Each structure stands twice: as C-alpha cells, then as structure tokens.
C-alpha cells in the first residue's frame, strides 16, 4: 500500500532530525555541560571570560581548520602539534640568537611549517602512503629537529612588536581574535565557495568519481596538507607571542584538541563532510568546556579523560550516521 504524503513528510522530518542529532548530538550534550558549569560558576559566561576564551582558542582554532581539511579528504594530520614547536624554535633562534627582524623570523618559521606540510602531502599523494603513518613519522622528525635547533633550551623573546601580536588590541579587540576571524572568513570562502573547496569534498566523498570527472587528487592532497602546515605555523606565531619564549616541547597533545573540535563540529572521518561554521562551534565548545573545568577546579587528569570521551562520542556518532561510507 502506498504511503500517504503526510506519512512521507513525517518520515522525512524524522530523518532530518536524526541526521542533525547524529551530527551535532555530542555538541548538545556539551552545551548542557556548559549550562551546568555556568550554574556552578557564575563567572563562566560573563563577557570578560568569553573574550578570554575566544582569545585562547585562536591557537586551537587554526589547527582545527587544518585538521578539518585533512579529515575531509579522508586523511589526518598528526604533525600540527609538532609544527607548533618547530615554528616556535625557528622564530626564537632567528630572532633571539641571530637578531633578524621579527617579521622575517615569522616568515621563516611559518615558511618551514608550510614546507613540511607540502612534504606530507607529497608523500601521501605521490606514493599513496597512509596519512596516519606519514604524519606520525613526520611528527617524530619535526620534534627531533626542534630539539636540535634549540638544544632543548628555551629561548626568551623580548621583541615588543612580536609579543604584542598576542597582547595588543585593535579597536578594543585582542589581536588573536582578529587573526582567527580573518582566517575563519578565508577558510569559509575557500572551502564552501571555490572550485578547490568543491574538489576537497569530491576527493573525500568518492575519490574514484572525482578522478574520473577530472579532479587532480594529487594537487588537492598536496594543497590540503600545505594549508594545514601554514595554519600550524600561524598558530605557533600566536602561541610563541603569548609565552614570550621559544620551546621545543610545546604543542604536545594539541592535535587531539584540534581533532576533537573538528569532529565535534561535524567533520566526518568518512570523508567528504565538513563545514567551517561547524568547526567554529566545535572550537568554542571545546574551549569553553576546558575553561569551565579549570574554573571549577577539575584536575587536568580528569580533563584528559573528558577530552578522550568527547572524541570517542563524536566518532561513534559519525560512524552511526555514515556507516555506509565507512
């Protein structure tokens, strides 16, 4: 017996609700957690604390965008935390020891991070190596180089222009927030409004169909990992400006925060599914949750447990909603 139009509409609405819950269900749970934290700590949702969180999440936000692109193509980039350290060490060495102008130091550091991203993409695209293996191995290489460059010692930076990148404000808005907003706009336009963005979704959604339609998988993959390296370099610039020191041991575990924010924002490990607005939501939720747990005195050990559970929950929902693609 044929279904009535009302029945079809009801089924369609149920599917739509199920899809939304599947994509953002873990986010809803975390929003409830934020409400509970706000009740426990009245300062949590004050404008001052929100601005503080927005300033701090700029670093993880830039890393998240790189992970978003890599995951959307069906890959992963585990080097972003190590890239923070390497870029920081290059900036510190060229500025603190060689006396280069601050701007050239930033160009050198971010340039090296971008180059390593290019190499990652080249190895993955040219030799069909697994992204996990390539980026995990390169993570070790980059960490080692960071230690070699600095000898494991911190390099203090006193250049006021450079340290002002984190501490200065423009029209009353902290510079890290301005940088994050500008990069967010660029990433949104690139991913959702350009041919390259469509190619990223095509390669992640069905690589064989993408190649058959004329899309160059090679340049898409190389481009994605190069951009991820560039964003990691910019994130390191902000981080190093914040701390006023270049260190080889920074960024450990930062890739997991970026992955959590990306997946929480709806980026699918199945590939071909992602939105920049979703990433922004994930970035803010992760930042607010960590900030809230700090404010109510939750141990860092328990915070690590929460972080792991968030990633597992988000990936489980992703697997359920995209079981056919997986």
Please describe what each predicted stretch is.
Residues 1-35, 212-219, 293-326:
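Cytosolic-side transmembrane-helix boundaries in multi-pass membrane proteins
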Residues 16-17, 76, 114-155, 190-195, ...:
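Short loop segments and helix-boundary regions at transmembrane helix junctions
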Residues 23-28, 53, 60, 82-86, ...:
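Hydrophobic alpha-helical transmembrane segments
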Residues 26-39, 67, 139, 143-144, ...:
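Hydrophobic core segments of alpha-helical transmembrane domains in multi-pass membrane transport
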Residues 32-98, 122-129, 266-276, 309, ...:
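Single transmembrane alpha-helix segments in multi-pass membrane proteins
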Residues 100-109, 115-120, 124, 171-246:
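Helix-loop-helix "hairpin" substructures at the membrane interface of multi-pass membrane proteins
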Residues 127, 131-194, 220-223, 242-251, ...:
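Transmembrane helix-bundle core of multi-pass membrane transporters
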